[in-house]
């Protein structure tokens, strides 16, 4: 993956070089995207649209922190979909981790969550946010214990895991593929900004249907797929049930009882 690699803190140039090596990133001064290491964090900027601001992972404050404190606990839709309302605390594999928000919610409710993010730039942002969260005095302990990023940014990561006899299968596989976004649908300013930047960097998950089969193979108890309310079922597979919210729904494919 080629994009601008910029270090704003001269003391961290070696760290940026390590990141580039780890995530197979190379510098391209003509790219519209810049991955910038500041003195505080790693962030993504769209150089030709500076008004969009920077995208970075913040699991401590902002909207994510607010949701952790006031988001409704095990009664919220994502928790019900994952089976937490059954009294279980399942192990979860988030196969489309993105900026880690949903994984963080599930981890804050007690679940051990392994995350796969196949795009190297997004994975680098998530890894940076995780490392900062691990140092936070309030949440660092359980973030370190419950959230793990699997360094597999290839498109066949789920396939590889499902065929790996040494990989411990999770109770639940959670998927939230990026869906092409109709212009007439309202989104919050933050989500709009992120979707615009991500869809131009990553593109919609046009091969998302291919995630369904390995997800079903991996999960021991259920697969949960988050979809916009207007979207079709993943891979045209009818779910066992759906939990609907105002703008989204969680399609649940049950394989076995949670208890």
Curated annotation (Swiss-Prot):
Example of a GO cellular component annotation carried by this entry: cytoplasm
Signal peptide stretch: none
Localization per Swiss-Prot or TrEMBL: Cytoplasm
Root EC class: transferase
GO MF: rRNA (guanine-N2-)-methyltransferase activity
Catalyzed reaction equations: guanosine(1516) in 16S rRNA + S-adenosyl-L-methionine = N(2)-methylguanosine(1516) in 16S rRNA + S-adenosyl-L-homocysteine + H(+)
Alphabetized InterPro entries for the sequence: 16SrRNA_methylTrfase_J, SAM-dependent_MTases_sf
Main location: cytoplasm
Binding-site residues for S-adenosyl-L-methionine, renumbered to this chain: 101-102, 117-118, 153-154, 176
EC number(s) recorded for this UniProt protein: 2.1.1.242
UniProt KW keywords: Cytoplasm, Methyltransferase, rRNA processing, S-adenosyl-L-methionine, Transferase
The keyword Transferase is annotated on this UniProt entry: yes
Pfam families: SAM_MT
Function: Specifically methylates the guanosine in position 1516 of 16S rRNA.
PANTHER family, sorted: RIBOSOMAL RNA SMALL SUBUNIT METHYLTRANSFERASE J (PTHR36112:SF1)
Family under the similarity heading: Belongs to the methyltransferase superfamily. RsmJ family.
Protein's name in the database: Ribosomal RNA small subunit methyltransferase J
Originating organism: Vibrio atlanticus (strain LGP32) (Vibrio splendidus (strain Mel32))
Protein's gene: rsmJ
């Amino acid at each position: 993956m080629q994009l601008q690699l910029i270090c704003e803190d001269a003391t961290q140039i070696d760290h940026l070089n390590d990141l580039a090596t780890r995530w197979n990133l190379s510098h391209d001064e003509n790219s519209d995207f810049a991955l910038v290491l500041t003195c505080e964090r790693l962030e993504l900027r769209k150089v030709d649209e500076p008004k969009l601001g920077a995208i970075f992972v913040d699991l401590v404050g902002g909207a994510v922190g607010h949701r952790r404190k006031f988001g409704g606990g095990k009664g919220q839709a994502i928790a019900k979909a994952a089976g937490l309302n059954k009294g279980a605390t399942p192990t979860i594999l988030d196969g489309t981790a993105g900026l880690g928000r949903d994984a963080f919610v599930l981890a804050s409710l007690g679940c051990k969550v392994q995350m796969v993010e196949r795009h190297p730039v997004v994975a680098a942002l998530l890894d940076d946010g995780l490392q900062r969260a691990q140092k936070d005095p309030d949440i660092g302990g359980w973030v370190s214990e419950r959230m793990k990023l699997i360094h597999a940014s290839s498109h066949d990561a789920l396939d590889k895991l499902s065929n790996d006899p040494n990989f411990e299968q999770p109770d639940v596989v959670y998927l939230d593929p990026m869906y092409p976004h109709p212009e007439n649908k309202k989104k919050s300013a933050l989500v709009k900004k992120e979707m615009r930047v991500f869809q131009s960097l990553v593109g919609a998950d046009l091969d998302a249907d291919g995630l369904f089969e390995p997800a079903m193979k991996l999960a021991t108890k259920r697969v949960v797929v988050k979809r916009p309310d207007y979207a079709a079922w993943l891979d045209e597979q009818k779910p066992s049930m759906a939990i609907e919210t105002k703008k989204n729904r969680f399609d649940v494919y049950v394989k076995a009882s949670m208890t």
